[in-house]
């Protein structure tokens, strides 16, 4: 059954963020629960022609949800996943030519012969009746597999030219983010067929993985194309502090673990860290001194609600809310938070084709929420 709520935006006092900007009086949002009892949902992807959306559940299920029809049974044909720790079935995106090919892409964690796991990506065809995925083919595997359950990353985004970007965590093995012969802690760029593009930055260098677009990444959790600049934006978890937003550029080093604004969970310095600003590494466009545990992110690119124009919404797992940010070119400022009173980990945030904001909560009985501003 659908439920409706009003939720208050909380405007934090954060003296360490000199670029914080208050919006003034608190506002509220309308919240409609479209679906509950979702077992740790991870991502959603909208289908065209008002056919609802696909939702991944971390345990390994792909479901279809549509207004008036509700939640489907699990779709068949999904690859086996390693659902341990932070691993499982992760992101889902439609291919740019979905209208013709019916192709969907999935990221997931898979285990190797030694019991350690890594991120894998593949595609298959979504059946016309939305009940199954056929001819699934894995085209990318993170190698070597080093994870015992942490830092898989897994976000997928197609850019405007049809290239697929895959955000990969460092499997909780810090030094690998700087090793160009490994795929841990990297942003990977492939063609829409899963092949390596000829213009990738390291394609002609020996001993370097040609899939790599940029590196020095810890644990990426959100990624989206900026609709106003057509640039790819990426967020990632820091350790204790130091969550970041970056605009990853070709061949650039984003620092981890050499440069970080965070410290170890123990309270001590990261052993490999040389400071916050390190020569040869890129600075984030925004960082949090206290980590909210950022997750899925969405630019608001609809005319439905003018007050949300030029906004970026980012889920927060630890803070259990959605961060509202204003975007001005390559700069962002935090305006406030919404969904602060629900007490749920926010896993994914998307702008729907109808102009509403859609949110997944990462709980054993997670929810699909439809959110709009309340005037």
What residues fall within each predicted segment?
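Acidic, Gly/Ser/Thr-rich repeat motifs that build Ca2+-stabilized beta-propeller blades
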Residues: 23-174, 222-225, 230-238, 290-328, ...
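Conserved blade-ending motifs and adjacent loop-strand segments that build the rim/top face
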Residues: 333-353
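Short, conserved, GDST-rich strand-edge loop motifs in beta-rich repeat architectures
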Residues: 166-184, 242-244, 248
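Beta-propeller blade signature
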Residues: 120-129, 180-192, 248
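Surface-exposed loop and turn segments in beta-propeller and other repeat-based domains
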Residues: 75-87, 136-149, 192-213, 258-289
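Repeat-solenoid scaffold signature
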Residues: 208-249
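Beta-strand initiation motifs
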Residues: 25-30, 69-73, 126-137, 194-209, ...
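N-terminal export leaders
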Residues: 1-7
